[in-house]
Amino acid sequence: DKKDLDLIKQTKIKAVNVLNENDFVKINGTWEAKRDGLMKILSSLPINYIWEIKERMIDHNIGYSEIVGVLTVKSGNIERRADGMGICSKIEFNEKVKFTLHNMNARAETRALKRAIETLFGSVINYFVMHNLGNK
């Protein structure tokens, strides 16, 4: 109804307003939202959210972790869900960033959560990029 549509609109406006240029990085010519910027969206808005791990595959022998999670966001009577999958393997680590099972799993889970946030708030992210970073 109209009240729900107004709530969605106001939430998106607030999300755009919490972002800044430092929340993005240009990778191969494309602006990508950083993890901290995406987490700001979740923590700065008047919404409730639940992050649940649905599947976890870890191969200790080859150093591979795959996480599938579901992000549920609630605002008023509106509830939205998005899946996110994150993968990390041992070959991504080096002398600077040491390989541990914790680091590998944490990186895979962060990637899964990031993808779910991008799915739910993609229009906000795209709007910010087009209006604030488009010519940079």
What are these regions (language model features)?
Residues 1-136:
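Polyanion-binding surfaces on beta-sheet-dominated domains and ring/shell assemblies
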